[in-house]
């Protein structure tokens, strides 16, 4: 459950999840992942014991979602590749429901060691799966569950108000259905964060023959992504205050920078917060645009304030120079501490504090 990322939670300006399950007594669950145990596991997974695997559909069946009517249909008879797709079956099960849950994504057969994906669009007819479920279900809200490792172009769901929630589950393993059910119903408050930058389009991704670091990873990315590295929502809210920075570090690699900040759970639920510390070099040409230098995940009860601390070592501030050697630049550094990267258009509803220090 700890890796699940809540990417969208917006129902006409209000949070949609967690579900008040008894409000959605008629539901449908569609897509190639609902009852396909193999798709719950990524590359290099151990041998599966299928008797112990809880699929997403099995997990949802343990809740009150669709207590009067729970329709389901994979739609794609060839799994996530979804080259063989039955639109009529998907549309039929989505008619007249109060809630739609769509599963989409990749699999270890579409992305694995020695087989990178060549595009970030949903494979096969999965985009038709989304639009069929949407058009057949009237005005019912839609939850998109994603199962993948590589970033995908889900801009349609991100910008579409019918898609009230998006959850990134990755390849969650044998208890997948239990984890998903717990998040949907609020038994667990998600706090996963994206470990990579999700480009808005393939045009933002450099060609593989370009060996520079320009636009590669969050450290050198200068464009507006679909979702930034380190992003992830919560069912509660957090506020940062009282940032303190003290430095004994120098450019010889001695000493350290100590950082402390107060984090307050200002919402109505207990939850984990992932505090992130980033550094920017001022006027250092060889340096990345920004770099993560500290991360801490802490459970914080509603109304509680805690102190989160980091120790930054000088070697974390090294850059590779034009002289082909590592060097710790002398000068001013900017530090940002919060639940996300600073200055991101797609952001979580918490503040980011900043300070400077010198070496």
List each language-model region with its residue ranges.
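Secreted, periplasmic, or luminal enzymes acting at the cell surface/secretory milieu
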Residues: 1-43, 48-55, 61-63, 147-272, ...
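Glycine/threonine-rich flexible loop motifs
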Residues: 38-39, 104-123
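A short helix->loop->beta-strand "cap" motif at the edges of active sites that frequently abuts
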Residues: 67-68, 136-142, 161-164
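An anion/phosphate-binding loop that grips the pyrophosphate of nucleotide cofactors and donors
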Residues: 97
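Short acidic, flexible loop segments centered on an aromatic residue
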Residues: 268-287, 292
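Intrinsically disordered, low-complexity Pro/Gly/Ser/Thr-rich segments with frequent PxxP/GP/PP motifs
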Residues: 284-320
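Short glycine/proline/serine/threonine-rich loop/turn segments at secondary-structure transition edges
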Residues: 316-332
């Amino acid at each position: 459950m700890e890796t699940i990322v809540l990417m969208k939670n917006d129902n006409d300006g209000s949070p949609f999840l967690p579900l008040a399950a008894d409000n959605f007594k008629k539901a449908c669950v569609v897509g190639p992942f609902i009852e396909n145990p193999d798709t719950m596991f990524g590359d290099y997974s151990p041998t599966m014991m299928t008797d112990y695997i809880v699929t997403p559909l099995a997990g949802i069946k343990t809740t009150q979602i669709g207590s009067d009517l729970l329709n389901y249909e994979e739609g794609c008879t060839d799994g996530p590749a979804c080259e063989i797709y039955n639109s009529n079956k998907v549309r039929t099960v989505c008619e007249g429901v109060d809630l739609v849950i769509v599963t989409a994504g990749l699999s270890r057969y579409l992305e694995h060691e020695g087989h990178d994906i060549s595009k970030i669009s949903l494979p096969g007819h999965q985009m038709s799966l989304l639009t069929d479920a949407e058009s057949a279900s009237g005005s019912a809200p839609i939850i998109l569950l994603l199962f993948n490792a590589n970033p995908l172009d889900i801009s349609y769901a991100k910008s579409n108000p019918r898609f009230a929630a998006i959850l990134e589950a990755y390849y969650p393993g044998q208890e997948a259905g239990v984890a998903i059910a717990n998040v949907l119903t609020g038994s667990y408050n998600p706090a996963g964060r994206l470990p990579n930058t999700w480009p808005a389009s393939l045009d933002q991704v450099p060609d593989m023959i370009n060996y520079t670091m320009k636009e590669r990873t969050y450290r050198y990315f200068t464009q507006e992504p679909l979702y930034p590295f380190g992003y992830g929502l919560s069912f509660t809210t957090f506020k940062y205050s009282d940032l303190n920075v003290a430095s004994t570090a120098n450019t010889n690699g001695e000493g350290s920078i100590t950082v402390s900040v107060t984090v307050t759970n200002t919402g109505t639920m207990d939850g984990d917060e992932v505090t992130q510390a980033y550094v920017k070099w001022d006027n250092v040409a060889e340096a990345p645009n920004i770099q993560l230098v500290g991360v801490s995940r802490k459970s914080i009860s509603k109304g509680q304030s805690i102190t989160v601390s980091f120790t930054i070592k000088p070697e974390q501030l090294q850059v590779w120079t034009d002289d082909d050697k590592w060097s710790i630049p002398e000068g001013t550094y900017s530090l940002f501490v919060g639940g996300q990267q600073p200055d991101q258009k797609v952001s979580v509803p918490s503040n980011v504090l900043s300070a400077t220090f010198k070496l």
